[in-house]
Amino acid sequence: MNQVIENVDFDSYISSFRKHLYHLFREEFDYGSISLKRDFPAEFLAEIMKKKPLAVAIPKLHAGRGVSVKECLAVLSAASYESLALSLMFGINIALFLEPLAKYGNFSVQERVFKDFMENNAMGGLMITEKAYGSDALNMKTGYEHIGNSYKIKGEKHWQGLSGAANYWLVTARKYTTTGELTRDIDFFVTENGNPEQHIPMVERYNNL
């Protein structure tokens, strides 16, 4: 499947993906009822992801289609036509997790995470905003310290998408100095929610997108 997605002509792929979404949203499932709740049913989402739409934001080196802006936008457009909620889900994964990871992530992390996306339809989001500071990243209070071969992150994030659904998070934090102050620079960490040592507990969840 991955090899087919990687090499198939994109015009053929996106046409097939649009037809796939049309069939799922308008024929196979009752989207009118599904849309009344926040989350897509697991079976419904699994059917959507069979076409590997997030492959457009994964490098070819990792069996993706190569992180083409044109292809990413086409997938978002196809999703938007059937569901804004689906488009938002894809947009968060593509623009806020996959593209930054592809551009800045360590190769070993890329290899492991992208494989999970391609083989298991994993999802990822970004944790940057905080309830008291919004988008004022320079005032964020989430901090980290380097302990041996690992990092310890402490803080609370306020996020409005993919809460409870993401398998991975791109978390922003500022380094603690020896005096306990926070530096101005912001660093990014990839956490895996299925790993007990990296799991980020959810304090509150809202019934929205």
Question: Across the structure, where does each feature detected by a protein language model lie?
Answer:
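Short acidic, glycine/serine/threonine-rich loops at helix termini
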Residues: 69, 101, 136-140, 163-166, ...
